[in-house]
Amino acid sequence: MEHLRIASDNYVAFTFFIGTMAMMAASVFFFLELNNTSKQWRTSVLVSGLITFIAAVHYYYMRSYNLETGDSPTFFRYVDWILTVPLMCVEFYLITKKAGAKIGLLWKLIFASLVMLVTGYVGEVLDRDGSVLWGVLSGIAYFYIVYLIWFGEVSKLAQQAGPQVAKATKVLGWFVLVGWAIYPLGYILGTPGGLFGIQLVSDTAAALNAMDIVYNIADAINKIGFGLVIYALSRTDNAAEKA
């Protein structure tokens, strides 16, 4: 009972709990729908379920860590991201594969996402004095992913794959452009380098608590929303082909 009371009084831990339940519920939904999904889109929906399942497991441990220590579970969060974000990038390859997406595109997306996350972790945890440099490197990798999705190979292949894929790719692109933009903000607020050397907040601990809440909400929206777009695509594309 004490454990539950602490969770209800701790807004950060409470959002970790909500995140765990939301991610797990989404995973169950995606996995159960696999039998109702055509073979063409089954892998994409499976990956969506894996993304939310991996996140649910990590959120369970992040909540426990936060309750026990009161600290932000930065390490566990990056472990989650380094597993789930590349999988989110894989989705772009999977949905454009029928238009001729090459394996090289898959590796570009995965490599860029790993560079973005590893450099972010180094700047936020291992080399905080050099956080500006690491943040810039992470940002370059992020904008490279944005370029591929909005103007590069992904965008061109999506147009060739048909109107349903093109529409879904655009929605997913907005998740990357807008939804993922919250994470650099957390990096800026939580590192001594701030915004190119300008510390934006005086109470970093309070900022990190606030950003944990924002991260948790953003993670749920981004990961579950990403999967729902893929799921909707699997339904609308099949319906269009049967019409």
List each language-model region with its residue ranges.
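C-terminal transmembrane-bundle signature of multipass membrane proteins
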Residues: 148-151, 171-243
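Hydrophobic transmembrane alpha-helical segments in integral membrane proteins
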Residues: 1-23
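Hydrophobic alpha-helical transmembrane segments of multi-pass membrane proteins
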Residues: 22, 44-62, 181-189
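Membrane-interfacial loop-to-transmembrane alpha-helix junctions, especially the N-terminal start
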Residues: 39-49, 101-109, 169-172
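Extracellular-loop-to-transmembrane junctions of the mid-late helices
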Residues: 125-151
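Internal transmembrane alpha-helix with an interfacial aromatic "cap," most often the third helix
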Residues: 27-33, 78-125
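Helix-loop junctions on the outward
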Residues: 55-78, 121-127
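Alpha-helical transmembrane segments in multipass membrane proteins, preferentially the mid-helix core
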Residues: 25-29, 90-91, 119, 141-163, ...
